[in-house]
A protein has these predicted regions:
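N-terminal cysteine/histidine-rich coordination modules
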Residues: 1-23, 27-34, 39-54
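Conserved Radical SAM active-site core
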Residues: 6, 36, 40-177
Length: 183
């Protein structure tokens, strides 16, 4: 059986800038796909959609070979490259094991626990809408756990419109029970 290949827009390392883990070193997996279209961001007149400038629709893609070649869009969704159909061909598609390795490669000492300070790094799933790929999130977390390096801090940045599947909720419950942490 062929292992499922997961479409994503980017993997990167930075400092978390908001929420509970603000200030924490964070490795990010931006999954491809979203169920919303938020074209109104940064538009001059939100009441007149026909006046909106949509950079992601107007961008010249003739020299774009990878996600990293795309310009930074100033209006509309700030991560339209992670869901717009015209960019889907640019999304890498890799197995959970390869993605887990890429996430670890960005961390000091290739580990979620810093080799010197013992500070925990944070893993954030974002998008698009990551809850459209709940099986992918579980597969990546399983691959990290199987490697002996599961993160202690995990965030799923969601737009709140997608329910957790029973399988994902049960998975998270098991994960938390095994860790001794509370919801």
């Amino acid at each position: 059986m062929t292992e499922r290949r997961i479409p994503y827009s980017e993997i990167f390392y930075s400092i978390q800038g908001e929420g509970r883990y603000c200030g924490a070193p964070t490795v990010w997996l931006r999954l491809f796909g979203c169920n919303l279209n938020c074209d109104g961001f940064m538009q001059d007149d939100l009441d007149v959609p026909e006046s909106w400038s949509l950079d992601y629709k107007d961008a010249d893609l003739s020299n774009v070979k990878a996600m990293g070649d795309l310009p930074v869009f100033q209006r509309g969704c700030d991560s339209s490259y992670s869901w717009a159909k015209r960019f889907r061909h640019l999304a890498p598609k890799e197995t959970a094991g390869i993605i887990a390795g890429r996430l670890r490669d960005l961390l000091p000492g290739r580990a979620f626990r810093h080799p010197t300070s013992a500070q925990d790094a944070h893993l954030a799933f974002t998008g698009g809408e990551p809850l459209m790929q709940q099986p992918a999130i579980m597969a990546v977390l399983d691959a990290l756990r199987d490697s002996g390096d599961a993160p202690n801090r995990i965030t799923v940045e969601t737009n709140g419109t997608r329910p957790l599947s029973k399988a994902f909720a049960d998975y998270l419950k098991r994960m938390l029970e095994e860790s001794g942490k509370e919801w």
